[in-house]
Amino acid sequence: MACNITNQRQQTLSTSGEALYEILGLQKGASNEDIKKTYRKLALKHHPDKNPDDPAAADKFKEINNAHTILTDMSKRNIYDKYGSLGLYVAEQFGDENVNTYFMLSSWWAKTLFVIIGLLTGCYFCCCLCCCCNCCCGRCRPKSSAPEEDFYVSPEDLEEQIKTDMEKDVDFPVVLQPTNANEKTQLIREGPRSYCTDS
């Protein structure tokens, strides 16, 4: 049980980004050539085929190989240098391109800003109303650029407008009235359909 706890402590995710360099015996920021040279030496020294009697050699070889794989991939190396093994875990979960966003949104100031805006807007209720419903029964609605005038039309003016419109349309009177229909009237005629009103 005690061994399990120490293994868990060793496997905790760090943010320093130095453990992989220490496995290879290098300083943080070493060049790619130094990483390759050191990897070759350590891989030959700890290879399981050269050390069949030492069970720890296989584990050490896996650690060396993992460190080399991460430190030679520039994208993973940049993430590791900036955020440590926690950054690599986040990259594995959300993708390399989302690591910066994750750490930005999980920073103390982003969390604080989220809480403050939530409190000021009543659990974001006010933000939703402003965006969707113009808030507070329309009182916060943006003002229109044209001034609103009360538009009133008197019944006499409306009647005069209708007469004027009818005088303009005198050229096209309605001449065909609909035919009377009853229960026995056939609604669909037999034969070709005609949409003309001249018949």
UniProtKB/Swiss-Prot annotation:
Q: How is it modified after translation?
A: Palmitoylated.
Keywords of this entry: Chaperone, Lipoprotein, Membrane, Palmitate, Phosphoprotein
Q: Mind telling me which CDD domains this protein's record contains?
A: DnaJ
Question: Which InterPro entries does the UniProt record give?
Answer: DnaJ_C_subfamily_member5, DnaJ_domain, J_dom_sf
Compartment(s) of residence: Membrane
Q: In which broad location class does this protein mainly occur, judging by the first location in its UniProt entry?
A: membrane
Q: What are its GO cellular component terms? A: cytoplasm; membrane
Its membrane topology, per UniProt? Lipid-anchor
What Pfam families does the entry give?
DnaJ
Domain annotation J: ranges: 19-84
At what positions is Phosphoserine found?
Answer: S14, S16
The record, for SUPFAM superfamilies, names: Chaperone J-domain
* Complexes and interactors: Interacts with the chaperone complex consisting of HSC70 and SGTA.
Mind telling me what this protein is named?
A: DnaJ homolog subfamily C member 5B
Name the species this protein comes from. Answer: Ailuropoda melanoleuca (Giant panda)
